[in-house]
Every structure is written in structure tokens, then in C-alpha cells.
């Protein structure tokens, strides 16, 4: 896929039929935030609330993410946020490999346009698609990886923290490391 301006990429994404997720979506959840952000957060895919509103991270997990951002002095409008897949998988299941492969060119294009210095992978699915297909979130989260001049880190997805609040301490350590890296840019 050739590098497209963000608006053209969005329009192409709206008309996408590259996988079966297009058959069940209410809305494409493209991404949002500052196009000039130094930091980009990438999640797995839209949930029910996101599919209904067409915006990323607006449900309970999004509310928790907002609090986590505020704790390191960031606001949603300061960052750019997107997902690996742009359409909701049925019953919030993990996206299938063919769905990820259909959508990943859109995300790569978004990353190229936003040109962040830091990418934060929220959860295992994002980390596997961006860092390493064998990524294990519990063993490998909180470490920095360098790719083409971009610092990449993975932490728990906010939905995982809602299911298992015991992981919040580790996520907080990750967010402090993110804040430190951002402050030193």
C-alpha cells in the first residue's frame, strides 16, 4: 500500500472489505488524536462501545486508559491512538491472523504519517503484531525495543487490568518508564 495522506487512508479504510470483519461492523474505528504526537498507543481492536461510536478506547478500558494517561501528565488529545484491526471481532474475540494481515497496512501507514518517537503496544495482540509474533506479555512487557528509530514498549491492555487488577502495579511501572522516555526526547 502506497503512503496515503491520513484523510485518504481513512476513506479507504471506511470502504474496506478485505476481511469478514467488514460484514459485522457498525463503524470502522480508524484512530484519533494528535497527528503531530511523539507517542502512539496501539491496541488490539474495537470493542462494542468503540464499534458503536467509531472511536478507539471509549468503553471501560478507555476510561482506565485516560486515567493512566493523566497519571503521567498526558491527555488523549496529546497522543495518537489506534488499533491493530479497525473493525470489531465478533464477541470481542482476539483478531484472527488473516484479519490482522488485512488491516496491518492501514496501521503501518498511520505510523508512517504520525511518525511517533514512541509506540506503546497495549496488550499481547498489539505486541505480537508490532514487536515479535512470539511475544509473551507477562514475560516481555516493560522492555524497550528499537525499530527504525522508534522506541517501542508493551504493557498490559487496560481491559486486562480491569479483569486482573493485580497487574496494575506492573502497568504503572511501565507507564512511569514511558513518561521518563517521553520526557527525555
Feature-to-residue mapping (PLM):
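A polyanion-binding, active-site-adjacent surface
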Residues: 1-185
Amino acid at each position: 500500500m502506497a503512503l496515503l495522506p491520513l484523510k485518504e487512508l481513512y476513506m479507504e479504510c471506511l470502504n474496506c472489505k478485505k476481511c469478514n470483519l467488514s460484514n459485522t461492523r457498525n463503524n470502522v474505528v480508524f484512530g484519533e488524536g494528535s497527528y503531530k504526537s511523539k507517542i502512539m498507543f496501539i491496541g488490539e481492536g474495537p470493542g462494542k462501545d468503540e464499534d458503536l461510536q467509531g472511536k478507539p478506547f471509549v468503553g471501560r478500558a478507555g476510561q482506565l486508559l485516560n486515567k493512566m494517561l493523566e497519571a503521567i501528565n498526558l491527555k488523549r488529545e496529546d497522543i495518537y491512538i489506534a488499533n491493530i484491526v479497525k473493525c470489531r471481532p465478533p464477541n470481542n474475540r482476539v483478531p484472527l491472523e488473516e484479519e490482522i494481515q488485512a488491516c496491518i497496512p492501514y496501521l503501518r501507514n498511520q505510523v508512517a504519517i504520525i511518525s511517533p518517537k514512541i509506540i506503546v503496544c497495549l496488550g499481547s495482540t498489539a505486541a505480537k503484531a508490532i514487536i515479535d509474533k512470539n511475544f509473551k506479555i507477562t514475560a516481555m512487557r516493560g522492555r524497550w525495543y528499537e525499530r527504525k528509530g522508534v522506541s517501542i514498549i508493551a504493557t498490559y491492555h487496560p481491559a486486562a487490568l480491569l479483569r486482573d487488577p493485580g497487574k496494575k502495579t506492573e502497568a504503572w511501572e511501565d507507564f512511569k518508564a514511558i513518561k521518563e522516555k517521553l520526557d527525555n526526547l
